[in-house]
Amino acid sequence: MNKRPNLAKRILPAAITLGLLAPVGFAPAVHGQEADTGTLEEIIITGSRGRPRTVGDSPVPVDVFTAEDLEAVSYTDTNDILRTLVPSFNLARQPISDGATFIRPASLRGLPTDKTLVLVNSKRRHRSALVSIGGSGTQNPDIATIPAAAIGSVEVLRDGASAQYGSDAIAGVINFILKDNRDGGSLSIDTGEYSEGDGKKTTITGNIGLPLGDDGFISVSGEFYEADATSRGVQYCGSWFCVDPSDAGYNSSAWYTEFTEDPTYQAGVPNANVGYGNVVQPWGEPDAEAASIFINAGYQIDDDTEAYAFGNYRKSESDGSFFYRYPRNGTIEQLREADGGIYDPLEKYPGGFTPRFEGDVMDFSIVGGMRGSLDNGLNYDISGRRGESEVSYTLGNTINPSMGRASPKSFHPGDLINEETQFQADFNIELDSDMDTAGPLLLAFGASFLDEKYEVVEGELNSYLAGPHAVKDPFAFCNGSVPTAAGTAVIGSGSTLNCADSDD
């Protein structure tokens, strides 16, 4: 981080802003270079809808990081890079946390994730399909979908900017400026693992710049990421059930000794968790694989007009763990079948089971527009954008208890889809004024149309079906403590049915 120099005392230019469904913009920001104490510098603040303004009384907390700054960080995930460079940028790995295992919610200054405005090339970034229902109930863009190789610089306004941008920017603004090189390129391969010997990660990133005619460019960036799972959990030992014989709580509850001392159960425990780790309930990062591409292009039509476009596509797959289901926990219960016999889910999972939660995430965006200036000094930027995010879930190594013996072991519980379409026009012009100001008046205005769509898609029927065992005594064997005709018939066939036993 550069030292923040003292600032020369200056008078702020006066500006008048007129908002007509005011579109979001993001003015460039620059740091003064590192200097000795006492050197007078000026900075350009981020947060103007028109041209940049200088400030003098006090520096607004704006951080600007170059591509070299990003490359100097040992991480390759853009989220982790920002977490390293920006102290107020917070995020963490969230094992066994629903969709947050696959799309990590990030925030500035400890505020909810949807209070940070994320921009790419000064255009609003679409939000991910994940709503953090287990936390703040908010929805934010997935910053991990932006490859670090595609970023030319990052501007972070670490202060509230809601007066300028609305409630989206209460915590601040992050603006990713994409590379615009028309030649050259880069390629890097990073690999490593944790000291525990797991979690091996390999990331391949690259960028290439190509000319587009005589006055244009196409900058193409790509990333491939692969990571093995980690496990930092210990063998399961809760207040109701304990798997670890070395734990002081082992066999403290006599009711489960019938399982822990059963050779069939003991033989099944190593297979309860089909994922990474030698414990029944892993705690760590999921297996993950992702591939992404980001393209930025521009063409100078004439001295006053430029056409631009940029977009991305990313596909990722992750496989994490859920909580261990031990015998008789409400999921693995003995069930009376239609013939009066007993079905025990332990037939499928002798040592209990730990569900696997998989998430396939797709992210797509395209932005295009034209900007320039007219002869009368009016500057314009007219653009449109489309963004889509989709999360598709799979739940494996589990059962639907209500279906009994007929239950499959893998389910598709549903999809989440977020779509955004926006068209906007930004204008600004400098006006002469007789007012005692440090410069001309700036009039900025514009219009915006935004259409947002969120969809929760139901999964396969078996994932939510209430099967026959969703109710007690589904085959009407008992009338209170007395067998019915159907109950008497199965008892006569050798069933152990006992209507006087409320647990039967």
Residue ranges and their predicted role:
Residues 62, 70, 82, 154, ...:
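Non-catalytic regulatory/gating segments with a bias toward low-complexity or hydrophobic composition
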Residues 80-81, 85, 104-106, 119, ...:
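N-terminal periplasmic accessory domains that precede
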Residues 183, 196-351, 355-369, 373-374:
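Transmembrane beta-barrel wall of Gram-negative outer-membrane proteins
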Residues 52, 83-127:
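Extracytoplasmic beta-strand/coil segments of soluble accessory domains associated
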Residues 298-317, 353-504:
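Face-selective signature of the C-terminal outer-membrane beta-barrel domain
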Residues 42-73, 79, 100, 129-135, ...:
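N-terminal periplasmic "start-of-domain" segments of outer-membrane beta-barrel proteins
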